[in-house]
Each structure stands twice: as C-alpha cells, then as structure tokens.
Amino acid sequence: MRTIFIRWMLTAVVAIAGGSVVAQTQTATVGTKVKQTKVCDPSNNPVELPYFGKKNLMIFYVDPDHASQNSAFVAELEENQVKSDKIYGFGIVNLKDAPLLPNSIVRMMVRRKVKKTRAAIYTDPDHMLRDAWGLGDVNDQFVLMLVAKDGTIEFLSKGELSKAQIDEFYRVVEKLKK
C-alpha cells in the first residue's frame, strides 16, 4: 500500500514542472467551465486551488488505493517533465474513496513528501473538488485534468490512459504552454 502511495506522490512531483458552469448533477467533460473551489492542505485546512484563474492547471486527482493506474504514463512523465511558467501542476489525494487508508496516516505521508520534495500536494476528504466540478464517479480512478486559466477543462481522463489520450494530453499541454 505504501509503495502505491509513494508512486502516486512521484506523479505529483513530476507534474510540478467553452461550456457552461457545472451543476453538481452534471458530469464534467472537455469544454466544461469550472469555478474556483476549495480542497485541503496536508494539515486538513481548507484552501483554494492554487493559481486558479492565474495559470493553466495540471491536476492529478488520485485515489490512493489505485495510484498504480497509468504507471507507464507516470514513468514517461518522469523522463519528460512538463516545464512551463504558464502551467502549474499539483496532486490531490482523493481521501473519501480510500477507506482502507486512515486519512491521518495519508496526510502524514503527504506532509513528509511535501517537506522532502516541495511538491504541491493537497487532499480532498469529502469529494469537495468532485462535487464542485461535477466530476462524477472518481472512485478507483486516476483522474488527470488540464484546466485553462479561464476555468475551461481542456483535458479530462479517468482511469487507465489509452495511447490516443496520452497523445491528446501532450497536444493540449503544448497548446497551454503558448
């Protein structure tokens, strides 16, 4: 379990380098416009999403029970990090859908990782992001999103990425770098 969580954390570290507003009952898709919302810092204090509206965001929203999804993609990102002053990347741990891992233990691990790597890692103990953005079912999912500065979802994937999705991810990254 710890190995899986650490692998997810590496994903978050690697990452650092329009539609209508979503109602809670809708499912977000590419083109959906989302609003600033809150998640929690590693000490469980509510915080707004960093740089929302100021930079394009690359968000890894991961269920730690299934953090090994997309391991080949994660390895590829480790080799070819996304580097741009226009894109801010961070991870969010979906605590609500990880009943086998006590939230306090996960937060402690996140705090250690943040201190060691200076990675931006947040937690979502109650589906705050999922509900605010209408992400639908995120249980057992590795969710990867690219959100433009104006709040438009430019890329959204849940679960294992296909080759076509990986190609699309990099295409959108290049678009957002400009």
Predicted regions and their residues:
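Bacterial N-terminal signal peptides that target proteins for export
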Residues: M1-L10
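N-proximal helix/coil linker or "cap" segments that precede and/or mark the start of modular domains
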Residues: V21-V34
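A short beta-strand-turn-helix
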Residues: T37-N56
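Short active-site neighborhood of thiol/selenol oxidoreductases, capturing the structured segment around
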Residues: P50-S71
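Structural microenvironment flanking redox-active thiols in thiol-disulfide oxidoreductases
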Residues: H66-K113, R130
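Short, internal strand/loop/helix patches
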Residues: F90, R107-D140
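Thiol-/selenol-based redox modules, centered on thioredoxin-like
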Residues: D140-K178
